[in-house]
Amino acid sequence: MNVIEEIHRRLPNTHLVMHGSSSVPQDLQDIINQYGGEMPQTWGVPVEEIQRGIRHGVRKINVDTDNRMAITGAIRKLLIEKPGEFDPRAYLKPAKEAMRKVCAARFTEFGSAGHAGNIRALSTAAMAKRYASGELHAKFGGDAAKAAAE
């Protein structure tokens, strides 16, 4: 996190990505293992650390493992509790709900909940035009260049 903070200090307009930043919730790991899974004990990135990264320029966080754990746990649970169930609609519904809960929690924890109205959809052609014009090119100069040189 110190490196992320230093990058943000030197290049405050640079957006960063945290790869492999799932929190790997213990409760989801427990559900998977309780219902026949064999997921070894593991840990992820604490949500508090991700929040710290967000305060210092992180704008994309890869947390898919948490979603996969929620889905897997819900499916395993239903298939153990209802072994005669074979209709995917029956076990995909709770899986989708489990994933929705994880996503809703992350939206809130990461400060993005309630901002959907601020997003304006653009066509591929409109985005191509913005890239071609240079509008979206990284800008290094001014105070950011001075800070990076320090």
PLM features per residue range, with description:
Residues M1-M18, S22, Q26-Q34:
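Alpha-helix-loop-beta-strand connector modules within alpha/beta enzyme cores
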Residues Q34, V45-E150:
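C-terminal alpha-helical cap/extension of soluble enzyme domains
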Residues V3-E5, E38-Q41, K82-E85:
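Short, surface-exposed linear patches
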Residues H19-P25, G44, D64-D66:
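Active-site beta-loop-alpha junctions enriched in small/polar residues
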Residues L16-H19, M39-Q41, R59-V63:
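Hydrophobic faces of well-ordered beta-strands that scaffold small-molecule active sites
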